[in-house]
């Protein structure tokens, strides 16, 4: 019986484990290298204003237009969110017939019928185009996916900052005698018909309200920051500034004062912003009127401007060329870089079927300050499932980072294009008598160097040039071509006065450093202040003794899934033990007691002595 109990409990542990897996996933598992790259770039960018932290996004129109406007078309979204896609662009239509926001570009006739209860897809036409739409589809379908992803990644280690971007459009008609027939077709007449849609813009994101960084929160931050600045009468000297203060001081000169990623993501615990990036609603008496409630939740261009560029024209390339060539024989044009760094705006570049992104063009856009939005329908040709990543991930994963080179961060064993050691691995240290001794053949692939392709994990004992950054001007760098150090020997005193050993924390800072390399005509690799010496794959700045800020954490949902299998198995085992104790009969033991009782009775009957035996 005991062995039977053990076998049954073992079976339960496997079966329950399949019911309550440790990690429920509707998309592909993200490989370790990609996950480390995502987290480390995010960590490096923590002091940077949130509007200048780069991200990549996807336009949902590419799924809807190729697969129809239904919830099934959103099946790839969760997988894309796990693959470093942090933005979702949505075309949102104001239906002037029903006065509701909807995702389908065409109005639904009021006499609409469905073929089956499970299949509610109907063909609807508008402006000489026909669409396949589900009348039940609404923004709640999108927001529930985002909400689930946010809940599953709501830890300091996994949390990322996201963007929901709206393109507002109208299902518009001109009021005239000829349009009475249209109103008879499309205006709601049957009160029993459940017209799906949202009454206000604010309603479209209500499922995510607790996670949204709003214009109201921005105003509170700006008010507090201005009071602090105005009340501070002390003069900060360059030497007394730490890096965080230096970054704050530089970006406080921005056109709009925005909080840092650290403040919003890890202090206020907000996970996303909602923007109206374009407003193409028709002017009409039936048009939607933006309310104060909408303005309290959603960013419009008056709060934070958005600039949208398209790959089918050269306007997006102009800024990239200007920054890449912003130098001459004597110095780098720092003013050009500062103009971009201090301009608070959302810079988006959107591709299409005629001019889709290439690996080369994508890397260029990301490095010069654009946030790419994938909009070509070729990206929707394959389902994203467990073990089957998206086309975006397979072809462009390495190009979505302004920081890391392709295949990084990775050690030399797994690296494809790593820069190999070219110098003698020799460093000097002092013994107990103060005499210098040479120490050779040291290998520690724990430090990060800048190469022409981006950041690479390199041997800390290699002697390279090192990047010195101006404390008060984030895009100004110095590279001493005559001084090379291994990573452990670099000190701030090795940099010119007013500079310190540092690293780029944004795409524009990265591009300004790479432009300085070209201007000063020095060779890669170049050390930057980043390493994972103390904890593997936890990349930190601050020298070789900088500590990893993370502990092993799990979300509440994951914790429940972790303990659920053990809890269920334990309860079943306890129930079985209880049943055994209460209902099990042991006839062998019962017979044994009866036999010995009879034997003893017969013995005393035959040997019945009187008195005390002698």
From Swiss-Prot:
Residues 18-558 are extracellular. Pfam families: TIM-barrel_MTC6. Glycans are attached at residues 31, 111, 128, 136, 177, 202, 230, 242, 313, 328, 343, 375, 388, 417, 424-425, 480-481. The keyword Glycoprotein applies. Residues 1-17 form the signal peptide. One of its GO terms (cellular component) is membrane. Residues 580-614 are cytoplasmic. The chain crosses the membrane at residues 559-579. The keyword Transcription regulation does not apply. InterPro entries: Telomere_Capping_Maintenance (IPR051008). It is found in: Membrane. It is a single-pass type I membrane protein. Its main location: membrane. Keywords: Glycoprotein, Membrane, Signal, Transmembrane, Transmembrane helix. Belongs to the MTC6 family. May be involved in telomere capping. This is Maintenance of telomere capping protein 6. It comes from Candida albicans (strain SC5314 / ATCC MYA-2876). The lineage of its organism: Eukaryota, Fungi, Dikarya, Ascomycota, Saccharomycotina. The gene is MTC6.
């Amino acid at each position: 019986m005991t062995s039977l109990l053990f076998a049954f409990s073992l079976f339960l542990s496997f079966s329950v484990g399949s019911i309550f897996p440790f990690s429920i996933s509707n998309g592909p598992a993200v490989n370790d290298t990609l996950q480390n790259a995502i987290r480390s770039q995010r960590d490096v960018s923590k002091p940077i204003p949130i509007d200048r932290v780069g991200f990549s996004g996807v336009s949902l129109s590419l799924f809807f237009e190729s697969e129809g406007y239904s919830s099934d078309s959103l099946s790839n979204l969760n997988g894309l969110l796990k693959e470093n896609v942090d933005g979702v662009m949505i075309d949102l239509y104001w239906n002037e017939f029903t006065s509701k926001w909807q995702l389908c570009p065409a109005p639904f006739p009021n006499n609409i019928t469905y073929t089956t209860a499970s299949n509610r897809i109907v063909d609807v036409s508008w402006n000489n185009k026909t669409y396949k739409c589900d009348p039940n589809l609404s923004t709640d379908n999108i927001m529930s996916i985002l909400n689930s992803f946010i809940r599953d990644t709501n830890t300091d280690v996994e949390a990322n900052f996201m963007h929901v971007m709206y393109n507002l459009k109208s299902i518009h008609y001109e009021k005239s005698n000829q349009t009475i027939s249209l109103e008879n077709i499309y205006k709601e007449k049957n009160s029993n018909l459940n017209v799906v849609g949202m009454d206000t813009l604010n309603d479209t994101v209500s499922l995510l309200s607790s996670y949204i960084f709003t214009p109201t929160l921005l105003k509170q931050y700006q008010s507090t920051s201005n009071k602090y600045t105005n009340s501070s009468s002390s003069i900060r000297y360059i030497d007394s500034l730490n890096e965080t203060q230096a970054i704050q001081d530089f970006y406080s000169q921005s056109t709009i004062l925005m909080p840092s990623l650290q403040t919003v993501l890890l202090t206020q615990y907000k996970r996303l912003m909602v923007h109206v990036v374009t407003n193409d609603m028709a002017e009409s008496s039936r048009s939607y009127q933006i309310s104060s409630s909408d303005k309290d939740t959603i960013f419009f261009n008056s709060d934070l401007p958005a600039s949208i560029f398209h790959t089918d024209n050269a306007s997006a390339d102009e800024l990239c060329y200007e920054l890449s060539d912003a130098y001459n024989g004597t110095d780098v044009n720092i003013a050009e870089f500062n103009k971009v760094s201090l301009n608070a705006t959302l810079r988006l570049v959107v591709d299409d079927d005629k001019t889709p992104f290439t690996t080369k063009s994508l890397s260029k856009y990301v490095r010069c300050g654009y946030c790419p939005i994938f909009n070509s329908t070729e990206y929707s040709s394959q389902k994203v499932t467990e073990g089957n990543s998206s086309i975006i991930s397979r072809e462009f994963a390495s190009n979505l980072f302004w920081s890391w080179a392709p295949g990084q961060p990775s050690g030399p064993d797994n690296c494809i294009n790593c820069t190999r050691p070219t110098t003698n691995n020799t460093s000097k240290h002092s013994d107990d008598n103060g005499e210098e001794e040479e120490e050779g053949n040291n290998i520690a692939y724990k430090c990060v160097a800048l190469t022409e392709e981006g950041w690479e994990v390199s041997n800390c004992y290699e002697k390279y040039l090192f990047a010195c950054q101006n404390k008060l001007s984030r895009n100004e760098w110095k590279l001493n071509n005559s001084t090379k150090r291994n990573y452990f020997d670099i000190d701030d005193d090795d940099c010119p006065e007013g500079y310190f050993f540092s690293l780029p924390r944004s795409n524009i800072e990265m591009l300004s450093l790479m432009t300085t390399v070209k201007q000063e005509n020095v060779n890669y690799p170049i050390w930057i202040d980043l390493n994972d010496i103390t904890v593997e794959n936890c990349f930190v700045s601050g020298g070789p003794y900088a500590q990893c800020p993370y502990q092993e954490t799990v979300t509440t949902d994951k914790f429940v899934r972790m303990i659920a299998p053990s809890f269920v198995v334990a309860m079943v085992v306890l129930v079985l033990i209880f049943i055994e104790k209460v209902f099990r009969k042991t006839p062998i033991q019962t017979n044994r007691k009866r036999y010995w009782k009879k034997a003893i009775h017969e013995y005393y009957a035959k040997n019945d002595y009187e008195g005390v035996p002698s």
